[in-house]
């Protein structure tokens, strides 16, 4: 779950300019002094709270959105709102939850980390997704993200995960700013499985440009389970997020006994080329 937030921070400062001009981003810094959390992290925390407190997913997604509706990072240029117009309308009951947007994928990682059977992961992924993204495309995409996390937690390697989930995504160049699951899923899984550590997975994702904070949030959420995260990144992340985020994360990792800070050597057994 820290991986999702670190990914969000990594892509946060690039997203606005990418809406005007898609271009690759090459950097050695994952988190900079200007990095900030966005709706990706906020809604990830909404899902996590639902699990920790046994609360309704839809209720907390709407609650968190309304609570952070006026949130704006200390960074310019930026969007008028931290949430998409369509999601705000859904939150206020002005729009049905039939989106196929990549927001379904970016917030879902706690489900993959907090449940211990494949059935529970699938069931809760469906519940957490369908309220706002009730399309086959969005539900399928978020399910792939959570199952990738779940299988990595269980010790499957990259090749085994790709074969089990029938993942064969190719590298692609973004011609426009990506917002749908279909536009996003290829570059996320390509970046994840083409890397051999967390930082490289994020860097590969940034090189594709586009919806950088969401893309990196999705990849980071899965890369954490596959590769672990260096302790320095966790410490740096904690400087950029509110105390209530840190408290929920601490509680979640304590309950699950997950060790986010680890370095797992991964063989270069990629299927994706």
What would you call each of these model-derived segments?
Residues 1-273:
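Structured, active/binding-site neighborhoods that engage oxygen-rich ligands
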């Amino acid at each position: 779950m820290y991986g999702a937030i670190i990914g969000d921070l990594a892509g946060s400062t690039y997203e606005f300019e990418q809406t005007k001009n898609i271009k690759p981003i090459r950097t050695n810094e994952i988190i900079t002094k200007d990095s900030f959390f966005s709706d990706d992290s906020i809604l990830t925390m909404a899902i996590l709270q639902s699990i920790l407190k046994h609360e309704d997913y839809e209720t907390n997604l709407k609650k968190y959105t309304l609570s952070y509706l006026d949130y704006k990072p200390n960074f310019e240029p930026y969007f008028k709102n931290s949430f998409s117009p369509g999601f705000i309308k859904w939150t206020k009951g002005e729009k049905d939850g039939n989106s196929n947007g990549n927001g379904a994928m970016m917030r879902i990682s706690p489900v993959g980390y907090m449940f211990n059977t494949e059935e529970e992961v699938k069931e809760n992924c469906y519940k957490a997704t369908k309220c706002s993204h009730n399309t086959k495309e969005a539900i399928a995409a978020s399910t792939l993200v959570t199952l990738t996390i779940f299988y990595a937690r269980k010790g499957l390697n990259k090749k085994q995960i790709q074969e089990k989930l029938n993942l064969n995504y190719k590298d692609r160049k973004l011609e426009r700013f990506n917002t749908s699951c279909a536009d996003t899923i290829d570059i996320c899984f390509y970046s994840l499985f083409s890397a051999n550590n967390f930082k490289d997975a994020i860097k590969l994702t940034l090189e594709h440009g586009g919806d950088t904070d969401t893309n990196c949030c999705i990849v980071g959420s899965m890369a954490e389970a596959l590769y672990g995260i260096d302790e320095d990144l966790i410490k740096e992340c904690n400087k950029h997020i509110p105390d209530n985020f840190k408290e929920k994360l601490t509680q979640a990792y304590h309950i699950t006994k997950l060790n986010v800070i680890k370095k797992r050597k991964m063989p270069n057994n990629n299927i994706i080329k």
